[in-house]
Regions:
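Short phosphate-binding/catalytic loops that engage adenosine nucleotides
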Residues: 29, 143-144, 224
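Active-site capping/gating segments
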Residues: 110-111, 224-248
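Glycine-rich adenosine-cofactor-binding loop
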Residues: 8, 102-105, 112, 116, ...
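Rossmann-like adenosine-cofactor binding region
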Residues: 156-227
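Phosphate/diphosphate ligand-binding glycine-rich loop within oxidoreductases
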Residues: 2-115
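Conserved beta-strand positions in the Rossmann-like core of class I SAM-dependent methyltransferases
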Residues: 34, 124, 147
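NAD(P)-binding Rossmann-fold cofactor-contacting core
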Residues: 141-159
Length: 248
């Protein structure tokens, strides 16, 4: 039986296992999808050694960047993004070749593009991790100017305390790429001047549990258009399946 899986830590919030195993059952596919909750990225080698029939795996927090040093090849797009969330395991003469891809960027682009209007020209990206890199790549490919927001001073980013109402008016697309507000921390949300938002504001939260985060709820209160990350997650899962089945 073929195996697929997900590496990350922690994985209590994982959607992929249920999605893929339901797909396999419904379509009569002889395969299973397993969560590999590994406390360090070095444990990936043990996962590979103990699962010789592993055909591919997804990568989530906090390993989308760290996994890259373990790969034999990486697509040019994933290298440009600087993060990998899909790995194809190619078996060759009793060994394996690991190839890294990024499906987050295309999935996010397909999800947010229908929401954009001509007046959406600048975006704030909350967070600096692997997911934020894919979001940045996608938004720039759509012609938007972007800037990352961080809790800490980092080159090329701004800190939350510098986001004034006038910044919110100018950067009217805001994407949360942090775990702030994720289950079980329902009451948490990024500290922003939500009162400056209006009907021209888009709030996109990569979180999908809960369905409506406090970030989204606060924006809706002032007329913002909001969306969670479920559609993006579904799209990247479909893209992952295509990659693993030689449709890349």
């Amino acid at each position: 039986m073929k195996k697929y899986g997900l590496i990350g830590y922690p994985l209590g919030h994982s959607f992929s296992k249920g999605f893929f195993n339901e797909k396999f059952e419904n379509e009569g596919i002889e395969a299973e999808y397993i969560n590999f909750e590994i406390p360090t990225i070095d444990a990936l080698l043990e996962v590979l050694a103990s699962n010789p029939d592993l055909e591919g795996f997804n990568v989530t927090i906090p390993y989308k960047q760290k996994v890259m040093s373990f790969l034999d090849s990486i697509t040019s797009e994933a290298r440009s993004i600087g993060a990998v969330n899909v790995v194809k395991v190619e078996h060759r003469n009793n060994t394996y070749h690991l190839k890294g891809y990024n499906s987050d960027a295309l999935a996010f682009k397909q999800s947010i593009e229908p929401m954009l209007e001509r007046f959406h020209k600048k975006a704030l990206i909350l967070g600096t991790g692997g997911a934020s890199k894919a979001v940045n790549y996608a938004l720039r490919s759509l012609g938007l100017e972007t800037i990352n927001v961080s809790r800490y001073e980092r080159p090329g980013t701004i800190q939350y305390q510098r986001i004034t109402p006038s910044v919110i008016k100018e950067y009217n697309v805001i994407v949360n790429c942090t775990p702030c507000g994720m289950y079980p921390h329902f009451d948490d949300c990024p500290q922003l001047p939500y009162e400056a938002m209006d009907s021209k504001t888009i709030l996109y939260d990569l979180i999908y549990n809960p369905d409506e985060t406090m970030f989204m709820r606060n924006g809706k209160q002032y007329g913002a258009t909001v969306k969670n990350g479920l559609e993006m997650l579904l799209l990247q899962a479909y893209i992952s399946w295509d990659i693993w089945n030689n449709n890349d």
